[in-house]
Amino acid sequence: MKNNQPIIQFKNVSKQFDNDPLVLDHVSFTIEKGKFYTLLGPSGCGKTTILRLIAGFTEASSGDIIFEGKRINHIPANKRPINTVFQDYALFPHLNVYENVAFGLRIKKLKKSMIDEKVKEALSFVNLVGYENREIKDMSGGQRQRVAIARAIVNEPAVILLDEPLSALDLKLRYQMQYELRELQQRLGITFIFVTHDQEEALAMSDEIFVLNKGKIQQSGTPNDIYDEPINRFVADFIGESNITKATMIEDYLVEFAGKQFTCVDMGMNANEPVEVVIRPEDMEITSVEQGMISVTVHTQLFRGVHYEITCLDSEGNEWLVQSTKKAIVGEQIGLRFHPEDIHVMRFNESEADFDRRLDSYSEGETDGE
């Protein structure tokens, strides 16, 4: 059961190598017990550095790393109740499955009967009972990953760190392992911190996501919150497909873009404030020019299996991406429709704290109006 107690806290943590630019720039966040967290971002954003700082593989240049209320900056990795599953799994090729999983327990000098019991339990969690004597070289990529996870959980750590463990798997197996990892975390109740650059993985598995770019957390929240209410252009563009355009917030609940004014659900900004608007492609409905809110010309069309991916151009040269089960014809004029709640207004340079306060005020307004 999730108890909402903090287990890890970063307080203004920075990391710099030599005289290079900051890899992490005054990062602060809280990790709660029993949840599945994902650190999401492009290469070089700082996500793996955060993982290494938590594990104790590197030290912070400044700031405090807190574990269960105690500062652990200088506590070595082997003294932390944290285990890591690496991208290449880091299994011992000369040891079989049992010996790999039992390795950490043997270092602790536990009795053989206890080691046998714990290894069997760990292998049962990852559906590998009966594989104890299998050589690592004879196992598939998915099986090797399960061995690595069993080796991590057998020590009963408080936190498991996963450094892009699915990246080497083929697409079908990657999807399967997403389900298995999520189910395993929920059964164990252990805090998982997962690193990836794949936004689909993050959305599918996480209780909460931290989106990073250039050493800073851009936004944190549930998958739904981040997808539905991105804080800025980077997050909107990185999490899923997006239509992003410059706009003007005329007044509360009224925004102007593509040469027209549209009703929206956003408020609390300055009159005529320059903003950006994001509309997800799946929220754009194809209709006739007469019924459309925006008139566009179909530019390209690709069949993606579950939908058509259609790019369109409006009279001002803005490109609109539409995902629809309706087929369009390249060169034809069509109309696009969307609802006020499909329009998400983003302020320039808004802090996450201010952003959260603004969204909270929307909920308070709904409550007051009831």
Curated annotation (Swiss-Prot):
<dbReference type="InterPro" id="IPR027417">
    <property type="entry name" value="P-loop_NTPase"/>
</dbReference>
<keyword id="KW-0547">Nucleotide-binding</keyword>
<dbReference type="GO" id="GO:0016887">
    <property type="term" value="F:ATP hydrolysis activity"/>
</dbReference>
<dbReference type="InterPro" id="IPR050093">
    <property type="entry name" value="ABC_SmlMolc_Importer"/>
</dbReference>
<comment type="subunit">
    <text>The complex is composed of two ATP-binding proteins (PotA), two transmembrane proteins (PotB and PotC) and a solute-binding protein (PotD).</text>
</comment>
<dbReference type="InterPro" id="IPR005893">
    <property type="entry name" value="PotA-like"/>
</dbReference>
<dbReference type="GO" id="GO:0005524">
    <property type="term" value="F:ATP binding"/>
</dbReference>
<dbReference type="InterPro" id="IPR008995">
    <property type="entry name" value="Mo/tungstate-bd_C_term_dom"/>
</dbReference>
<feature type="binding site">
    <location>
        <begin position="41"/>
        <end position="48"/>
    </location>
    <ligand>
        <name>ATP</name>
    </ligand>
</feature>
<dbReference type="GO" id="GO:0043190">
    <property type="term" value="C:ATP-binding cassette (ABC) transporter complex"/>
</dbReference>
<dbReference type="InterPro" id="IPR003593">
    <property type="entry name" value="AAA+_ATPase"/>
</dbReference>
<dbReference type="Pfam" id="PF08402">
    <property type="entry name" value="TOBE_2"/>
</dbReference>
<dbReference type="GO" id="GO:0015594">
    <property type="term" value="F:ABC-type putrescine transporter activity"/>
</dbReference>
<dbReference type="Pfam" id="PF00005">
    <property type="entry name" value="ABC_tran"/>
</dbReference>
<keyword id="KW-0813">Transport</keyword>
<protein>
    <recommendedName>
        <fullName>Spermidine/putrescine import ATP-binding protein PotA</fullName>
        <ecNumber>7.6.2.11</ecNumber>
    </recommendedName>
</protein>
<dbReference type="InterPro" id="IPR017871">
    <property type="entry name" value="ABC_transporter-like_CS"/>
</dbReference>
<comment type="similarity">
    <text>Belongs to the ABC transporter superfamily. Spermidine/putrescine importer (TC 3.A.1.11.1) family.</text>
</comment>
<comment type="function">
    <text>Part of the ABC transporter complex PotABCD involved in spermidine/putrescine import. Responsible for energy coupling to the transport system.</text>
</comment>
<keyword id="KW-0472">Membrane</keyword>
<dbReference type="InterPro" id="IPR017879">
    <property type="entry name" value="PotA_ATP-bd"/>
</dbReference>
<dbReference type="InterPro" id="IPR013611">
    <property type="entry name" value="Transp-assoc_OB_typ2"/>
</dbReference>
<dbReference type="InterPro" id="IPR003439">
    <property type="entry name" value="ABC_transporter-like_ATP-bd"/>
</dbReference>
<feature type="domain" description="ABC transporter">
    <location>
        <begin position="8"/>
        <end position="239"/>
    </location>
</feature>
<keyword id="KW-1278">Translocase</keyword>
<keyword id="KW-1003">Cell membrane</keyword>
<keyword id="KW-0067">ATP-binding</keyword>
